[in-house]
């Protein structure tokens, strides 16, 4: 059986899916609070930048993969309006439930679905925009997921990946201390779960850097791939098009 990484561990591919699911079942109820604490609220700025780059218009069809608690889907649904179609999807039932409830509380009615990004249950060339924010690094076969995103986006449409990336080199040591000391401590104090947040820090380090992810998106069949470094490369937004 093929091996893959779960944080810094090597595990069977089938085992990884269960382990990742366990992490997000555990953190779902505290996910938004922890995001604010871990990023100092910057995750909201990164998402606002992504929303601006997506440039969703009335009538657009948008797929938000690994949409979690629904920040992007909520904004897209308001932009696409009643003639549009915005799907909030996630492979994790606990995260999807939190996201669906948050959308309802905000008065946003949009469809939700459990969705494995490696097997997206939508037809070819269906969406104008496909997004995944802070989800790609948890996927076992990133190449398959990217190919599926390319498949379901329309010609001329965008595939957008917002993800933690390779930080500017002078900041690496400080960033390591924060990631491997502060994050697990916050996870313990706020969520009672240091191990899940240790995994999140490790998964960031194992994720491809900016140029490698750009090449992966190109290999998946996307064109005109570019990326934007945010907060000194702590996060990068990659954007590719299907021509």
From Swiss-Prot:
It is an enzyme of class 2 (transferase). GO terms for molecular function: 2-methoxy-6-polyprenyl-1,4-benzoquinol methyltransferase activity; demethylmenaquinone methyltransferase activity. It comes from the Bacteria. InterPro entries: SAM-dependent_MTases_sf, UbiE/COQ5_MeTrFase, UbiE/COQ5_MeTrFase_CS. Its EC number is 2.1.1.163, 2.1.1.201. Pathway: Quinol/quinone metabolism; menaquinone biosynthesis; menaquinol from 1,4-dihydroxy-2-naphthoate: step 2/2; Cofactor biosynthesis; ubiquinone biosynthesis. This is Ubiquinone/menaquinone biosynthesis C-methyltransferase UbiE. It comes from Ralstonia pickettii (strain 12J).
């Amino acid at each position: 059986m093929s091996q893959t990484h779960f944080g810094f561990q090597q595990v069977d591919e089938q085992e990884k899916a269960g382990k990742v699911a366990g992490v997000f079942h555990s953190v779902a109820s505290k996910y938004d609070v922890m995001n604010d604490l871990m990023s100092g609220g910057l995750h909201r700025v990164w998402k606002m930048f992504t929303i601006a780059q997506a440039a969703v218009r009335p009538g657009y069809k948008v797929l938000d993969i690994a949409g979690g608690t629904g920040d992007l889907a909520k904004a897209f649904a308001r932009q696409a309006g009643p003639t549009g179609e915005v799907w909030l999807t996630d492979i994790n039932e606990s995260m999807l439930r939190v996201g669906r409830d948050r959308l309802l509380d905000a008065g946003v009615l949009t469809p939700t679905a459990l969705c494995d990004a490696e097997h997206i249950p939508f037809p070819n060339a269906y969406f104008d925009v496909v997004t995944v924010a802070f989800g790609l690094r948890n996927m076992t076969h990133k190449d398959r997921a990217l190919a599926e995103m390319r498949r379901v986006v329309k010609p001329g449409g965008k595939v957008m990946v917002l993800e933690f990336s390779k930080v500017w080199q002078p900041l690496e040591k400080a960033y390591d201390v924060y990631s491997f000391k502060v994050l697990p401590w916050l996870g313990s104090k706020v969520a009672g779960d240091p191990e899940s947040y240790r995994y999140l820090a490790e998964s960031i380090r194992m994720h491809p850097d900016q140029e490698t992810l750009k090449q992966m998106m190109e290999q998946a069949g996307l064109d005109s791939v570019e990326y934007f470094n945010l907060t000194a490369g702590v996060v990068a937004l990659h954007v590719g098009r299907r021509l």
